[in-house]
Amino acid sequence: MTNILIVEDEQNLARFLELELTHDNYSVDIEYEGQAGLDKALSNNYDLIILDLMLPNINGLEICRRVRQEQSTPIIIITAKSDTYDKVTGLDYGADDYIVKPFEIEELFARIRAVLRRQPQKDIIDINGIKIDVDAFNVTINGEQLDFTKTEYDLLYLLATNRNRVLQREQILDHVWGYDSEVETNVVDVYIRYLRNKLKPYGKDKTIETVRGVGYVIR
């Protein structure tokens, strides 16, 4: 599912956009202030940001500039500022498109589709709602990034890429810790527990199954 962040201080408009987008099978988060929007944009892995320019705390141009310093997430500016100078400035700050209010929802949807088509397809592994971004080396659930160590990520990636195949502890140890590692096989059980503890708040801890006497598998 495509994850969209809306940063818009007009609450009625923001909620209307959320309703229309979710009806069209997009996942939507809303922030009504600039700082909160910037924080959310930088701490999550969104597919698209819809951004107003005139916001409390931090204006949309500054958010656009800051996001573009760290991410390539596409940004569509929606604003009442219709001067050519404002449009050029917004695009020069890193926005991918610029729409002047008021606008028709059909036009916004068409522009969203066009912007998303221009983005390279991400290499994403989706296991029961657990999304592993192979390019970014991160894991998200419902758009929220989980705090994984490299070893935890490598372990989850190994299980996910061998879905429905039971992996023995020795196999896991060799792939994740290396063939020359002197680590005991019980460390695999410890790290499986770490993974389950981090997945549990999202109801995903049972995604990793124990095959008694053998090892582990993701179905």
From Swiss-Prot:
<keyword id="KW-0963">Cytoplasm</keyword>
<dbReference type="InterPro" id="IPR039420">
    <property type="entry name" value="WalR-like"/>
</dbReference>
<dbReference type="GO" id="GO:0032993">
    <property type="term" value="C:protein-DNA complex"/>
</dbReference>
<dbReference type="Pfam" id="PF00072">
    <property type="entry name" value="Response_reg"/>
</dbReference>
<dbReference type="GO" id="GO:0006355">
    <property type="term" value="P:regulation of DNA-templated transcription"/>
</dbReference>
<protein>
    <recommendedName>
        <fullName>Response regulator ArlR</fullName>
    </recommendedName>
</protein>
<dbReference type="InterPro" id="IPR016032">
    <property type="entry name" value="Sig_transdc_resp-reg_C-effctor"/>
</dbReference>
<keyword id="KW-0805">Transcription regulation</keyword>
<dbReference type="GO" id="GO:0000976">
    <property type="term" value="F:transcription cis-regulatory region binding"/>
</dbReference>
<dbReference type="InterPro" id="IPR001789">
    <property type="entry name" value="Sig_transdc_resp-reg_receiver"/>
</dbReference>
<dbReference type="GO" id="GO:0000156">
    <property type="term" value="F:phosphorelay response regulator activity"/>
</dbReference>
<keyword id="KW-0902">Two-component regulatory system</keyword>
<feature type="modified residue" description="4-aspartylphosphate">
    <location>
        <position position="52"/>
    </location>
</feature>
<dbReference type="InterPro" id="IPR011006">
    <property type="entry name" value="CheY-like_superfamily"/>
</dbReference>
<keyword id="KW-0238">DNA-binding</keyword>
<dbReference type="GO" id="GO:0005829">
    <property type="term" value="C:cytosol"/>
</dbReference>
<keyword id="KW-0597">Phosphoprotein</keyword>
<dbReference type="Pfam" id="PF00486">
    <property type="entry name" value="Trans_reg_C"/>
</dbReference>
<dbReference type="InterPro" id="IPR036388">
    <property type="entry name" value="WH-like_DNA-bd_sf"/>
</dbReference>
<dbReference type="InterPro" id="IPR001867">
    <property type="entry name" value="OmpR/PhoB-type_DNA-bd"/>
</dbReference>
<feature type="domain" description="Response regulatory">
    <location>
        <begin position="3"/>
        <end position="116"/>
    </location>
</feature>
<keyword id="KW-0804">Transcription</keyword>
<feature type="DNA-binding region" description="OmpR/PhoB-type">
    <location>
        <begin position="122"/>
        <end position="219"/>
    </location>
</feature>
<comment type="function">
    <text>Member of the two-component regulatory system ArlS/ArlR.</text>
</comment>
